[in-house]
Amino acid sequence: MSENYTPRLKTRYREEIREKLNGEFSYENVMQIPGVTKVVVNMGVGDAARDSKLINGAIEDLTKITGQKPQIRTAKKAIANFKLREGMPIGARVTLRGDRMWEFLDRLLTVALPRIRDFRGLNDKQFDGHGNYTFGLSEQSMFYEIDVDKIDRPRGMNITVVTTATNDDEGRALLRELGFPFKQKGSAE
């Protein structure tokens, strides 16, 4: 990325969304206006305990999707019933901050989520009480960086959007303004 390039979602947040949120919640200080701190993309690969090559596919997919090399997550303790030993790789995680985070959110909202078959919106009850939002995707094929013909197996992932909001209402308002497609209250499940 060049020096003077700013992601369009970041520009929209700075120029429009902050003013709307300030008008809606009337903050005393501009630093109280909620913003997005980081986005964590986690891909659990429980089968990697039996076949260690499976983690490589998850790492490859996450690298393509996020543009950043994932951190391999290992088992913290052994569980005999799952044939799991301490230190075995069981997942991969990427933490996105700054411009990469804004680019990922933009691609997620404008390209990936609309490509999901029978997508009716995200559940708006999955906030943690502090304005952070977590949702899961069942497979990786909706990202255009992934070649559908080369997918060895469908892999789901959890995406957590960490915000500076103090409660769920502020977080929900921020994400709705950013363009997160939440389900409408009146629609049937």
UniProtKB/Swiss-Prot annotation:
This is Large ribosomal subunit protein uL5. NCBIfam families: PRK00010.1 (NF000585). It comes from Corynebacterium jeikeium (strain K411). This is one of the proteins that bind and probably mediate the attachment of the 5S RNA into the large ribosomal subunit, where it forms part of the central protuberance. In the 70S ribosome it contacts protein S13 of the 30S subunit (bridge B1b), connecting the 2 subunits; this bridge is implicated in subunit movement. Contacts the P site tRNA; the 5S rRNA and some of its associated proteins might help stabilize positioning of ribosome-bound tRNAs. Coiled coil: none annotated. One of its GO terms (molecular function) is structural constituent of ribosome. Part of the 50S ribosomal subunit; part of the 5S rRNA/L5/L18/L25 subcomplex. Contacts the 5S rRNA and the P site tRNA. Forms a bridge to the 30S subunit in the 70S ribosome. It comes from the Bacteria. Keywords: Ribonucleoprotein, Ribosomal protein, RNA-binding, rRNA-binding, tRNA-binding.
